Amino acid sequence: KFDVILNMEIVEHVDNVDFFLLKSSELLKKNGLMFIATLNKTLKSYIFAIVGAEYVLQWLPIGTHDWDKFVKPDDLIKICKNNNLKLEKLDGMNFNLITDQWKISSDDSVNYIGKFKKI
């Protein structure tokens, strides 16, 4: 079992988030930490992550993301709670096109990251 698991930009690509996080949780030691970074399911995330990143900027191949698989923070928290993962912190992550930098933010409308502890 592991002390820390990083599920970074993965859950928005899996077919069954509940099963994926169940299996991830089973691999985590008690009191271990799981970090989950993903995309919120909002109109803004559709515009930025799919239209912007795939079609306009062409950072990713078209079809990389399926908006139906994006996960709202409240839904992620519930799934994690059902798998013995307690939310410790949740923040938005915002990318600045001008500075080419990411920053932690209270705005979780596109990208966000959660820190969960195995109980």
Where does each model-flagged region fall?
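Conserved SAM-binding loop
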Residues: 1-46, 73-76, 114-118
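Acceptor-substrate binding/catalytic loop of class I
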Residues: 38, 55-75
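Residue-level marker for beta-strand->alpha-helix junctions and adjacent short loops that shape enzyme
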Residues: 41, 95-97
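Short, flexible, mixed-charge acidic loops at enzyme active sites
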Residues: 45-55
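A conserved catalytic-core signature of glycosyltransferases
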Residues: 46-47, 66, 71, 111
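Short Asp/Glu-rich motifs
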Residues: 46-47, 98-100
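Short alpha-helix
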Residues: 67-90
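Core SAM-dependent methyltransferase catalytic element
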Residues: 100-119
